[in-house]
Amino acid sequence: MKNELEKVMSGRDMTENEMNMLANSIIQGELSEVQIASFLVALKMKGEAASELTGLARALQKAAIPIPTNLTNAMDNCGTGGDRSFSFNISTTAAFVLAAGGVNMAKHGNRSITSKSGSADVLEALGINLYLPAEKLAQVFDKVGLVFLFAQNLHPAMKYFTPVRRQLEIPTIMNLTGPLINPIPLDTQLLGTSRPDLLELTANVLKGLGRKRALVITGEGGMDEATPFGLNHYALLENDKVTLHEFRASEVGISEVQLNDIRGGEAPENAEILKNVLENQPSAFLETTVLNAGLGFYANGKVDSIKSGVDLAREVISTGAALTKLHELQAEQIG
């Protein structure tokens, strides 16, 4: 640990193998919380490298509990969190729209770290069982085409990181790594990050981890979602190449709103917002969900433009298919 910490503090990047070995030491309980915290902070101050993200992701994914699903072409749309926007649960709401539109959604998430309500919190408020065994989760996914994978339940190694992250109260490499370690192998991904400087790097990490197509998004003001206001920046992984782009919501058929219009609350309030959106009740929440679901359809390759994805998202919600998908998950992911 001492050599690795000195290397990072001197501004040098760790190799993928060095990070992998250090991560395994943490997973095996060989390092104290103080050592883990100092390492996370040192990495943040230096700036995380692709080799470090990849090495950590591979170690954590290998240590995860596998989900024996029969489905292929799985996708996730989780973000890094840590943007302190206190918005409603955008990607979680959009996941129902994507699943209703024919995308196999392996929604990976956790409880809140820096916000009022994480994806696990809001889904628990909707009656979703976070603690099903892997075999049952696979059955849910195979039947519904959507499942929620609770990170704490499926990543035993996280118990060494979670207390440290809560005490630090700042985004670290763990925020960046969380979306990379879905227990179900992913073919495509929409990943939100609060750091626009990491768009290209993250897309290249996803490429290295085997994604066939992916989109990494940063919204206005560093939100880890596409925003219905201001300028959105994204990196697109397509045909093994990463390209950078930008767009405004108004350019793809979304009514622009303000950040205050999409702020959420505690889990029960956000659960109500989610249901209202899937019921197609007009609001800034609906526009934001349509935008991010549309982006998800584009990231998945189901449509050939963000605008086409937005149109598909509106159709899926207006027909009631997204609300039906919520009811299906509520009926299956129980126990």
UniProtKB/Swiss-Prot annotation:
GO terms for biological process: L-tryptophan biosynthetic process. InterPro entries: Anthranilate_Pribosyl_Tfrase, Glycosyl_Trfase_fam3, Glycosyl_Trfase_fam3_N_dom, Glycosyl_Trfase_fam3_N_dom_sf, Nuc_phospho_transferase. Anthranilate 2 binds at residue 165. Its cofactor is Mg(2+). It comes from the Bacteria. Keywords: Amino-acid biosynthesis, Aromatic amino acid biosynthesis, Glycosyltransferase, Magnesium, Metal-binding, Transferase, Tryptophan biosynthesis. 5-phospho-alpha-D-ribose 1-diphosphate binds at residues 79, 82-83, 87, 89-92, 107-115, 119. Its EC number is 2.4.2.18. The keyword Isomerase does not apply. Belongs to the anthranilate phosphoribosyltransferase family. Homodimer. This is Anthranilate phosphoribosyltransferase. The lineage of its organism: Bacteria, Bacillati, Bacillota, Bacilli, Lactobacillales. The gene is trpD.
